[in-house]
From Swiss-Prot:
Intracellular or extracellular location(s): Cell inner membrane
GO molecular function: NAD binding; NADH:ubiquinone reductase (non-electrogenic) activity; quinone binding
Membrane topology reported for the UniProt record: Peripheral membrane protein
Keyword terms, alphabetized: Cell inner membrane, Cell membrane, Membrane, NAD, Quinone, Translocase, Transport, Ubiquinone
One cellular component term from this protein's GO annotations in UniProt: plasma membrane
Similarity-based family: Belongs to the complex I 49 kDa subunit family.
Keyword Protein transport: no
Role of this protein: NDH-1 shuttles electrons from NADH, via FMN and iron-sulfur (Fe-S) centers, to quinones in the respiratory chain. The immediate electron acceptor for the enzyme in this species is believed to be ubiquinone. Couples the redox reaction to proton translocation (for every two electrons transferred, four hydrogen ions are translocated across the cytoplasmic membrane), and thus conserves the redox energy in a proton gradient.
Quaternary structure annotation from Swiss-Prot or TrEMBL: NDH-1 is composed of 14 different subunits. Subunits NuoB, C, D, E, F, and G constitute the peripheral sector of the complex.
Species of the source: Helicobacter pylori (strain HPAG1)
Database matches in SUPFAM superfamilies: HydB/Nqo4-like
Protein name: NADH-quinone oxidoreductase subunit D
UniProt-listed InterPro entries: NADH_Q_OxRdtase_suD (IPR001135), NDH1_su_D/H (IPR022885), NiFe-Hase_large (IPR029014)
Amino acid sequence: MAQNFTKLNPQFENIIFEHDDNQMILNFGPQHPSSHGQLRLILELEGEKIIKATPEIGYLHRGCEKLGENMTYNEYMPTTDRLDYTSSTSNNYAYAYAVETLLNLEIPRRAQVIRTILLELNRMISHIFFISVHALDVGAMSVFLYAFKTREYGLDLMEDYCGARLTHNAIRIGGVPLDLPPNWLEGLKKFLGEMRECKKLIQGLLDKNRIWRMRLENVGVVTQKMAQSWGMSGIMLRGTGIAYDIRKEEPYELYKELDFDVPVGNYGDSYDRYCLYMLEIDESIRIIEQLIPMYAKTDTPIMAQNPHYISAPKEDIMTQNYALMQHFVLVAQGMRPPIGEVYAPTESPKGELGFFIHSEGEPYPHRLKIRAPSFYHIGALSDILVGQYLADAVTVIGSTNAVFGEVDR
């Protein structure tokens, strides 16, 4: 006998589920441990199989885009840390890159080297974090412990550079706030060795593990057509066999000068995505090893030189009246970019992260829009989960590597 179910949430009041006695409606989250209180999935089940999935988001909404329209360009930078909080440096850079494109700033080479090192270090930290918590979701707890130990070394490096372990705020509009500390590169080289050893250890635990492969292979399959229609990017897209990486297609900073590969998958399933995260760690190590000798050959400033938009060096501010006055105006009133609009895409650890900024020549954006990859990947769950078993839902959600700080903006 058919029954109708109408959800009480106004957002879903028009969604009516019609099913027979063999079907069931299940609310997955937001209380479920794997959804971390940030995702609700309305699942329609036929036995153990999912026949319909409706994601509900908004549990972490903080109005980040609207905040950007009420802050000066420099004031907004710390807010970007709170988007994808597992890779905050990537958020800092994506925002700074958009503003710099709007201002047509030329970034000193030394700052470019430091930025690219930080971005790839941040990518490795984010990837090893994903692998560890994804393995924990599936039940491989020992992987979580080994990976987190190595991740701590990377966070120590970020703390040595910028003073923060999670919300780094390590990028500035026009460059970077600090040069690399003494002996920092030696610590970085040591970390690269630790990361290699950790990666080998994890692969030894997982790659030939029958349970791990059974839980991931042919689970959460994404086709090329599905990936393109949902606007997927990053590893979710490359897992289907499409070799699209913004660092290659629209290179920024020093990526045009660097030699690295873009790994792609064959089947688009959860196991392919896991393998790509592991392979990308190798590529990040390879990139950083090319950047370390580049750093020694640079001696330019670490901030762009433009008195209309960028403060003078601190030693000048402390000793010269003109520099002090210029700094006061930039801090008190904010910079005034030219009228125009820009969209600047970057390749974050999750995929394409870009900021659209529309300027009316005021000290704050007239419109700020964030293109975050996790938003599209969570939306695609309504397609990916159909046909999957309920027991595999956690695996599929985890394999998207979505962070809800950038989903709910």
